[in-house]
């Protein structure tokens, strides 16, 4: 399945939002970088999945708390309460995208350098529990 031009821009915006958010954390919770990261991330999600699916995703009954926390955190960041806003927004991100952590862990395990580390018998159960990966007993 190939991406449309809008979806390609959406991936770029989402990645840019992630980078600005990360730079905002590295610069001791710089309000402008965190806010720009939030805006770019939301625009990217909107471009990737479309307006109707974005609305449906953020208003699902099991995602409403995460959406509320994300928006309240972003609002607090704009009101110069950056650390508290970051904490609340992080809880919202976990609430919204926590279902994808298992997929991300499985993808990272297929990578050359980090894969063996995540698959190590001492580390794998901890990572599986944190990511919510269900392992069959067989």
From Swiss-Prot:
- Chief location category: Golgi
A Pfam family hit: Got1
Q: What does this protein do?
A: Nonessential protein required for the fusion of ER-derived transport vesicles with the Golgi complex. Can be replaced by SFT2.
Family the UniProt entry places it in:
Belongs to the GOT1 family.
Q: List where in the cell it is found.
A: Golgi apparatus membrane
Q: Which residues lie on this side of the membrane: Lumenal?
A: 30-31, 89-112
Q: How does it sit in the membrane?
A: Multi-pass membrane protein
Give yes or no: UniProt keyword Ion transport: no
Q: Membrane-spanning residues where?
A: 9-29, 32-52, 68-88, 113-133
What InterPro entries does this protein map onto? Got1, Vesicle_transpt_Got1/SFT2
Q: Where is the signal peptide?
A: none
Q: Which GO terms describe its cellular component?
A: COPII-coated ER to Golgi transport vesicle; cytosol; endoplasmic reticulum; Golgi apparatus; Golgi cis cisterna; Golgi membrane
Q: Which GO terms describe its biological process?
A: endoplasmic reticulum to Golgi vesicle-mediated transport; protein transport; retrograde transport, endosome to Golgi
The superkingdom of the source organism is Eukaryota
Protein name, UniProt field: Protein transport protein GOT1
| Key words of the record | Golgi apparatus, Membrane, Protein transport, Transmembrane, Transmembrane helix, Transport
Respond yes or no to whether keyword Ribosomal protein is given for this record.
Answer: no
Report the source organism. Saccharomyces cerevisiae (strain ATCC 204508 / S288c)
Disruption effect? Lack of GOT1 is lethal in a strain lacking SFT2.
Record topology, Cytoplasmic segments = 1-8, 53-67, 134-138
């Amino acid at each position: 399945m190939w991406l449309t031009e809008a979806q390609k821009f959406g991936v770029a915006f989402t990645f840019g939002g992630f980078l600005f958010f990360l730079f905002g954390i590295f610069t001791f919770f710089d309000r402008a970088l965190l806010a720009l990261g939030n805006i770019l991330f939301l625009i990217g999600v909107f471009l990737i999945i479309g307006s109707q699916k974005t609305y449906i995703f953020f208003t699902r009954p099991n995602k409403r708390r995460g959406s509320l926390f994300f928006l309240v955190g972003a609002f607090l960041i704009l009101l110069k309460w950056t650390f508290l806003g970051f904490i609340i927004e992080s809880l919202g991100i976990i609430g919204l995208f926590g279902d994808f952590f298992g997929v991300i862990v499985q993808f990272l395990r297929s990578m050359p350098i980090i894969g063996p580390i995540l698959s190590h018998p001492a580390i794998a159960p901890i990572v599986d529990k944190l990511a919510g990966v269900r392992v069959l007993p067989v």
